[in-house]
Amino acid sequence: METDIIKSNVENLELYSDNYPFSLSLKINTFHSESEYKKFVRNCEASIRRSIEYKLWRNYIIDVLQINECVITHESIDEVSIDVHHHIPSLFTMISALINRNLENNVKFCTFDICQEIMELHFKNKLGYVTLLKSMHEKFHNGRLDIPINFVKGDYRYFMTNFSKYLDDQDLETIESRLAINQSNCSWSRDNYPAAIGE
């Protein structure tokens, strides 16, 4: 096969051939379907979670800053597995907002552009997170745990100020309901947290 039929538009980061009507661009500014959009978001999410930078960020939170106990049970990493949970926004929501912003402004992007910007938000502390016991983290994602907003670390307000306009109504409702949860109206207390409640 001849390689000289493959050409490149270096400025646009695009491959093409005079022999074929189709070209291939590194960056996109549209999706052909909702499933393609969600697949792209999930790919970004997986790439971020697998990255060295994400692991360094997580380890810095837990090992260096010593934020290494469950905010609910106060059990520490010496006793149990502790997760860092993105809370306002979720990682999926954060990625969606960045993609939606780019789509709305007709800015071309690729997976790596989105992942880099998300990691920059992590390193600027411009997102919310809490440390949770692994089983509490599962409980939250199963809809069985409320997290009071005063437990959240990081500048989650930055996200709301700068990216909420790029979210759909369902995402906004979810975030608003989470923002409204405090210690006086959540479904548990320190002496009666969900792990001890019969379900």
Question: Language-model segments: which ranges?
Answer:
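Generic detector of ordered, mature protein regions
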Residues: E53, W57, I95-N102, N142, ...
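The −1 position to Zn-ligating cysteines in a subset of zinc-ribbon hairpins
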Residues: E69, D83, L132
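Histidine (H) residue identity feature
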Residues: H32, Y60, H74, H85-H87, ...
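Histidine-centered nuclease catalytic patch
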Residues: E75-G128
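A detector for short metal-coordination/catalytic motifs
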Residues: H122-G128, L132-E199
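Short, structured coil/loop segments at alpha-helix boundaries
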Residues: R50-S51, K108-F112, L133
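A boundary/linker detector
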Residues: M1-E69, H74-D78, L167-E199
